[in-house]
Amino acid sequence: METSLPITVVFLIVLITGAQTKPTQGSCTLTDEDISDIKSAVQKASKAAVNDIVLDPTLIDKCPMLEKITASLKSVATEIVQMRDSAISTDQVDQLKQNFEDQVNQIVKSRDIFEKQSGTQATKEHGEMLERMTALQVKVTELEQQIAKQTASMYEDMAELIFQRLQMNSTESVRSYTKHMMEEKLEELMNKLETNYRIYLGALRFLNHMNDQELIGKVFDGILKRLGDMKADSDDVKENGRNLLVNLLCWTVNNDFLGKKYKERQVDLYRMALKFYPKTYEKAANEADVRSRQFCEENFPANLITWFAVSWNDRG
């Protein structure tokens, strides 16, 4: 039997989602009959059927936070549908869907949220309903984050498998298309790859398999230019730049041609390291940051960036 939730649960949503819970937006005047309708809608969500996750607009008028809860459930259901359409392994998606269904059913069984309370007047009180719906929002948000982690991991596994299959079964048409994308649409391609740096590095390593040195050189130079054009005046740009730089260095490992390119462009790499890691005196922190970003086992990226920093300090 679950213990009753303390009133401070109202503030948990701020910690978990970053949402701004304001008293003026906390109106929630639901009845037990309304709660029953909400429970039914949540149960339908367990089947990951996006079109079934619908609430009567009057319920949202009574309790505006239900809009966020419904949106979260739809978001997860949509993600599962997309995974089902694009996945290589249906077993993985079935497992994800089953996990989602189990978790939603656990939420539905939560007595603190959905059990009918004694006394009709008490159920209409603003404070109690706000607490119950906030508890529901917390649980749904936790579920959304859990599913997001699982799907991110699955997408990474799928991407790695795709690159492995391309290397084993690369045809002339695959090579030709890859070359076209890298030469003609590098910026557009990088924009897509930069949403996941493990996939980004996988794509670069696929170029090694093609063994087209001219193309590899163009891509290397193109990424360096991209780094150079970035205005590192916001946290998002700095984060992206660091991830690109670190995994660009990962790409150069165990590649003789890129080893030569690295030597040719060493001054530019030096400048990029200082651009995205300007606090050169924080060697240990910089090294830890680099290692947290790299998708290769080698020490080269961390050693190189911290060596650049030491070299810069020695100049002073």
UniProtKB/Swiss-Prot annotation:
Induction context: Up-regulated in the salivary glands of fully engorged blood-fed mosquitoes at 6 hours after feeding.
Annotated keywords: Glycoprotein, Secreted, Signal
Major location category of this protein: secreted
UniProt entry tagged with the keyword Aminoacyl-tRNA synthetase: no
Region described as Involved in interaction with human CD47: 126-316
Tissue: Female salivary gland (at protein level). Saliva (at protein level). Some expression in ovary and midgut (at protein level).
Glycosylation, residue list: N169
UniProt entry tagged with the keyword tRNA-binding: no
Domain of life where this protein originates: Eukaryota
Region forming the signal peptide: 1-21
GO cellular component: extracellular region
Cell compartment(s), UniProt: Secreted
Note from the entry: Passive immunization against the protein decreases IL1B and CXCL2 expression, prevents macrophages from infiltrating the bite site, protects susceptible mice from early replication of Zika virus and ameliorates virus-induced pathogenesis. Average amount of protein per pair of salivary glands is 47 ng. Average protein concentration in mosquito saliva ranges between 0.71 to 349 uM.
Subunit description: Interacts with human CD4. Interacts with human CD47; the interaction results in inhibition of phagocytosis activity of host macrophages.
UniProt function note: Activates host neutrophils; induces expression of IL1B and CXCL2 at the bite site. Promotes activation of human CD4(+) T-cells. Inhibits phagocytosis activity of host macrophages via the interaction with CD47 receptor on their surface. Suppresses expression of pro-inflammatory cytokines, such as IFN-gamma/IFNG, IL2, TNF-alpha/TNF, IL12B, IL8/CXCL8, IL6, in host white blood cells. Reduces host polymorphonuclear neutrophil chemotaxis induced by N-formylmethionine-leucylphenylalanine (fMLF). Reduces CD11b/ITGAM expression in fMLF-induced host polymorphonuclear neutrophils. (Microbial infection) Enhances early replication of Zika virus in the host.
Stated name of the protein: Neutrophil-stimulating factor 1
Species this protein is from: Aedes aegypti (Yellowfever mosquito)
